[in-house]
Structure formats: structure tokens, C-alpha cells
Amino acid sequence: MKFVDSAKIYVKGGNGGNGCMSFRREKYVPKGGPDGGDGGRGGHVYLRADGQMSTLLDFRYKKHYEAQRGVHGQGSKKNGKMGKDTVIPVPCGTVVRNAADGSLIADLTEEGEELLVAEGGKGGKGNPHFASSTRQAPRYAEPGGVGMALEIELELKLMADVGLVGFPNAGKSTLISSVSAARPKIADYPFTTLVPNLGIVQYREYSSFVMADIPGIIEGAAEGKGLGLQFLKHIERTKVLAVLIAADSEDIEAEYASLKREMERFGSGLLEKPRVVLITKMDIAPEDFSVPSFSDDAPVLMISSVTGEGIDVLKDELWSRVKSEG
């Protein structure tokens, strides 16, 4: 399935049903009073967070959503039914903004969370509402109100516990495929991963956490170079970052410093998140490899997703940090 993380849609509440102008007409009641029913309220439009959805792809094909109109009132004081609401499912982690000014409307993060985005119009009042001592036979009924209309922007920010960060070919996709059921494309060239991937990592017998693999960062990602800026937002919500650097990197310390710079430039508190440095591909580490140390005292783990070296220790470390972050 194609991954789409932004969309713009038009939503409109249903118009209210018209009130009815009617008079009681029965045998032996030649001058019955007004008996027009009220119109029904128009349907509302809601967004609902759905944990089964992982992309905004559907909104590339359908961009207009309108709730049902309220039913008109009838004679004999029969009120019209309310219009049916329209409920639009969106992935958990969807940010909703007003397209006109970019203002934040809501951030839907919890399964089943609902947001009213367009109210239906009020039902019009039937002519009995307009009767008075001086006007006992009003020949007027109120039309239904117009439903609210709004253009909204949807932006998906993935929900994960651990975010994998690294330059292209650092081994992120291989790691997530080795510890979860996720099967991202893997190859020995840069930018194999073109979209984010989520994997559920089983820990011990009854626990698990969610890991997110995003396309590799390059120098200047925070300024929009490469794929970095587009996808760095998907690790904003993560509790812990795992920074991956390949053991055969020419300069591990310099690569780590570069990754930190990009996270700092992007902002959103990425650099303040707890992180673990993973030296990957230890199965092909050079003979003169030495364990690096970093000035920020970030814990360093040596792993190989191919041989399984260090994977259990990695799971222990990540689980401990995820739990400590709540």
C-alpha cells in the first residue's frame, strides 16, 4: 500500500430540514390551527481515529465529505428526522488543521477518539412556533439552517515508541526486519527505504513496543535536502531514539555529530529525547575497530542484525527506556 502522510479535504454538515407550514384540516374542524412540524437537524461530520489505518491514501481519491440533510417537517406536527452523521476514519496520529489559516484544530492520537469538524444546520421551525394572540394562522415556516463547511488539512505523524535514526545504509531496515514482522525493502545501496515502516517488537512473553524506521537522513535534511525533512516528523512522537551508525563507517564520531546537528536543526525536541547509539553491522567490522565514546555519554551498543549479536541486550535497553518514559 502506498504511504501518504498529508491530505486536504472539504467537509460539510448537512443542511437542516425546512419547517412545515400546515393547518389542521379535519371534518367538523373548519378552522384548525397551524400544525406544521419542525425540520430535522442536518447530520454532523466527524473524524474518528482508527488504529487499523496507517496512511492517508484514501483521501487522495475522495476529497469531499458531506453529511445527510435533515428531513423536512410535515403536517399534523410531524417533525422531520435528523440527517445521518458522516464519520470519516483517519489513522491514529493525525493532526487536523484549518486549511484557511493553518491553525491547529486537534491532534487525534487515541483509538476511537472523535472530532466534530462540521456541524449540521439546525432544523427549521414549523408554523405553530409563529402563532400568537394577534396572528393565529401564521402562513410562515422557517427554512432549515445551512450546514457548516470547512476545508481541513490532515497530516499524519506516526505513533511509535522507538524511532530509528541514521544515514542511508546504516542498517535500519535490516534491524527492524530482524526484531519484528515488518518487511521493508532491503538492499546494499542508499535510500532503499522511501517511506516509514512500523514494526511491533515482541519483548519477553507478554510485552511489546513499536519501532519506526524512517528514510535515511543526509546532511541538510533539516533544510529539506533528501527525504529527511519530510519524514523526521514521524519520530517527533517517539519516546526513545536509536541512532544507528555502521561499524564500517569512515568516521563514527563525525557521523554521530552530524546526525545530532540535523536533529537539533529540525527542532521539536528531538535532541532532548533519550537515545541509544547502535553500532551496526558488527559482522563486517574492520579488524582495527575500537568502541567509540561520545561526549554526551550516550550508551553505545554493538549489534549485528545478521548474526543476532547484541539484539537481546538491545531489546532490554530499549524496553527499559520506553517504560521509564511512560
UniProtKB/Swiss-Prot annotation:
Report keywords, A-Z: Cytoplasm, GTP-binding, Hydrolase, Magnesium, Metal-binding, Nucleotide-binding
Broadest EC class assigned to this enzyme: hydrolase
In the Enzyme Commission scheme, what number(s) does this protein have? 3.6.5.-
- Principal place of residence: cytoplasm
Which residues hold Mg(2+)? 173, 193
What are the recorded GO MF terms, alphabetically? GTP binding; GTPase activity; magnesium ion binding
One GO CC term on file: cytoplasm
Q: State the source organism's domain of life.
A: Bacteria
Where's the Obg domain?
1-159
- Residues bound to GTP are 166-173, 191-195, 213-216, 280-283, 304-306
**Which segments carry the region annotation Disordered?**
119-138
Q: Which cofactor does it need?
A: Mg(2+)
Q: What does this protein do?
A: An essential GTPase which binds GTP, GDP and possibly (p)ppGpp with moderate affinity, with high nucleotide exchange rates and a fairly low GTP hydrolysis rate. Plays a role in control of the cell cycle, stress response, ribosome biogenesis and in those bacteria that undergo differentiation, in morphogenesis control.
Q: Which NCBIfam families match?
A: Obg_CgtA, PRK12297.1, PRK12299.1
Subunit comment: Monomer.
The molecule here is called GTPase Obg
Q: What is the lineage of its organism?
A: Bacteria, Pseudomonadati, Chlorobiota, Chlorobiia, Chlorobiales
Gene that produces this protein: obg
